[in-house]
């Protein structure tokens, strides 16, 4: 005999107020993405939310988890080439599975992970694997689908003010540049292109691997290309506006080497 369960979530709440975002966060799992013919494996962190109407006490949390699991199970090795070709396509696949399991008007899926890219060192031309924090979000409301892509890139800056007033000597510091692009789902925007826009805007990029000639090259480049954090933010913004459609947000933080505080520059377009 089939056991009957009480659907507490379907009951009316004492306080009848609609909630625009209810769901799960900090869920870690595995994902496989086929990007330009290569299969990448990620251990991403998911956040998935839907709207909750005023007459419902709660949402069915397990159905949200099932939607992620179903989308993951499709991406077996022999089939991954046919489906998830980007993190945003994976996020949309989760929403599509959720539509089969749970009624809602609005759904969001956010995926945070680390993207590892191959770079060549500037002088010795050796291979270096560089990590970048990235986040992708897909929001579906009715027939409208938007996506947001975010990248966080580490570079460095050399202070032009100290250089101008100290016979060419200056202080340098690590800087963190963030770029966020929000646009229609079908617009072509890649995380790799966004990373390149940010990384090329610093005094110099940073590298995981540096041999002595590479270290010398990075130092020379910094001193030949001094920039305020404001310069970096403006350069990222103008490059991003030319390259990417949609709304753009730029944030740069300089971890100051001669101060006890940091410096920030931020802009929107």
From Swiss-Prot:
Keyword NAD (UniProt): no
PANTHER family in the cross-refs: GTP CYCLOHYDROLASE MPTA (PTHR36445:SF1)
Designated name of the protein: GTP cyclohydrolase MptA
Function per UniProt: Converts GTP to 7,8-dihydro-D-neopterin 2',3'-cyclic phosphate, the first intermediate in the biosynthesis of coenzyme methanopterin.
Catalytic activity: GTP + H2O = 7,8-dihydroneopterin 2',3'-cyclic phosphate + formate + diphosphate + H(+)
Cofactor(s) in the UniProt record: Fe(2+)
Stated family: Belongs to the GTP cyclohydrolase IV family.
Organism, as annotated: Pyrococcus horikoshii (strain ATCC 700860 / DSM 12428 / JCM 9974 / NBRC 100139 / OT-3)
Cofactor binding remark: Binds 1 Fe(2+) ion per subunit.
Record-linked InterPro entries: GTP_cyclohydrolase_FolE2/MptA, GTP_cyclohydrolase_MptA
Keyword Cytoplasm: no
Annotated site location: May be catalytically important: 159
Record key words, sorted: Hydrolase, Iron, Metal-binding
A Pfam family of this chain: GCHY-1
GO biological process assignments: tetrahydromethanopterin biosynthetic process
Subunit structure: Homodimer.
Pathway: Cofactor biosynthesis; 5,6,7,8-tetrahydromethanopterin biosynthesis
Annotated GO MF terms: GTP cyclohydrolase I activity; GTP cyclohydrolase IV activity; iron ion binding
EC number(s) stated in the UniProt entry for this protein: 3.5.4.39
Cleaved signal peptide residues: none
């Amino acid at each position: 005999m089939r056991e009957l369960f009480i659907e507490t979530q379907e009951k009316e709440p004492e306080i009848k107020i609609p909630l625009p975002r209810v769901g799960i966060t900090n869920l870690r799992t595995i994902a496989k993405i086929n990007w330009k013919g290569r299969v990448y494996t990620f251990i991403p962190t998911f956040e998935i939310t839907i709207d909750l109407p005023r007459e419902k006490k709660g949402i069915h949390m397990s159905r949200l988890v099932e939607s992620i699991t179903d989308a993951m199970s499709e991406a077996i090795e022999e089939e991954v080439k046919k489906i998830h070709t980007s993190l945003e396509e994976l996020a949309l696949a989760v929403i599509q599975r959720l539509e089969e399991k749970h009624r809602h008007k609005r759904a969001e899926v956010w995926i945070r992970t680390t993207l590892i890219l191959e770079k060549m060192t500037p002088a010795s031309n050796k291979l270096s694997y560089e990590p970048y924090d990235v986040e992708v979000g897909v929001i579906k409301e009715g027939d409208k689908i938007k996506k947001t892509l975010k990248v966080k890139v580490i570079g460095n800056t050399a202070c032009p003010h100290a250089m101008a007033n100290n016979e060419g000597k200056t202080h340098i510091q690590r800087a963190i540049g963030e770029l966020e692009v929000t646009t229609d789902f079908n617009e072509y925007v890649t995380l790799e292109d966004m990373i390149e826009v940010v990384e090329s805007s610093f005094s110099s990029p940073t590298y995981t691997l540096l041999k002595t000639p590479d270290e010398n090259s990075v130092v020379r480049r910094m001193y030949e290309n001094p920039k305020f954090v404001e310069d970096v933010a403006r350069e990222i913004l103008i490059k991003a506006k030319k390259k990417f459609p949609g709304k753009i947000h730029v944030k740069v933080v300089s971890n100051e080497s001669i101060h006890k505080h940091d410096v920030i520059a931020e802009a929107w377009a």
